[in-house]
Amino acid sequence: MDSFSPKSYYDSLLIMDELPESLRPISFIEYHLFSYLGCVLALFQGNAVSNWGYSYTVTENGFPFSRDLQNSIDMLEKKGFIFVDENGLFSPNPELVTKEIENFYFVDEIPKRRELIKTSLECALSIPPGAIRYAIKDT
């Protein structure tokens, strides 16, 4: 198994825990996009990008991609915390995701990261992912 950062693991769980029913299931592109938007929101709050805990590249199609996050997603799938359907779309196993997050109750930064991830998901409810991709590609 490839390595991943603890923060990418938390975020991969938090995305699934906070994902509104109306957005389910999500693609791996959306998974990375929601994480990236959380990082951008943290930047706007005055946090250094390096403090996010893992990095991104932007694909030639304009989507953010994090190897650490992808490795975390792969781990969640192997552990049965998330399901992948025949179209490659992800949905949570809610009970297992919630229980796993509870194992990290002692991590002080989780509530803040949860709020950033939740806000990034709320953006998806009002801004089409294509518009977000266009903005990322042109920066």
PLM region spans:
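Domain-edge interaction signal
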Residues: 1-139
